[in-house]
Structure formats: structure tokens, C-alpha cells
Amino acid sequence: MPSVEGLGGFFTTVGVVNDPCRCKGVLVVDLCKQVNGLDRSGTLQVVAPDGYMMVFSHDQVLGDFHTYDPKTFREVPHDDLNMILMYEIDGKPLSDHNGKPLRIAIVSSESRYLTEGHNWVKWVNKMVIRNASSNFV
């Protein structure tokens, strides 16, 4: 499966900013396609071993997220966002602190966006597709 690189940064609920960094991984939508895809009305659950879980819509898997200006935190329009399952940050494998072995990242070709940190699931160990007709783990 081909790797994808992009720039992504996020902010936490307490206002800590993680400046955009170079992220490398595989497109989550491509992973979903490997098991018959994600229906338009389906969801993707991303789970970490500590019990943290995020549920993403079909549109989010395709890159539809709110984006914010890194200086003003005002919402700004975006163009080419991708959701990836990241395994490398700034040219190095993820550390435990950064979410080793795998982490969800929201990336773009430009570093002008921040996204909300709760979407950047660390330590991913399971993804579950929930479609109306079937479930894939």
C-alpha cells in the first residue's frame, strides 16, 4: 500500500498547540477499501489500548474536518485534507510519546491548518468499520 506524506498540526482542549509537522502513513480510506470499504452512512471506530475511542463519519475518513488558523484559532476553509494512519513523524518512527506504533493524523500539503487534537488518536490498535449491512475489524 503506498505511503502518503503531509503536514499536520493540532491543538488540545486546554489550548496546547502542536505545530504542524511532516507526517507519513497510509490513507485510512485505502485501508477501508481493503475490506470492502466504508458505506456513505457507515462509521469508522478507531480504538487505542487505553480505552480511548473516536468514531469517524464517512466524510471525515475522506478528509472533512474543521480547520483552524494556527495564530488566531479562527475556523478557516480547507482544501486537501487527508486522514492517515501515521507511523512516521518528521522522518522518524513514532515514539511512545507521539503515539507509537500508529496514530491517526489529519494532514494537508500545506502547514497552514490546525485540527482538533481529539481526532489524533494515539496508540491505535484496532479499527472497526460499521456499515449498515456488515462490520469489519
Which residues make up each language-model segment?
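N-terminal intrinsically disordered, low-complexity segments enriched in P/E/S/T
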Residues: M1-V137
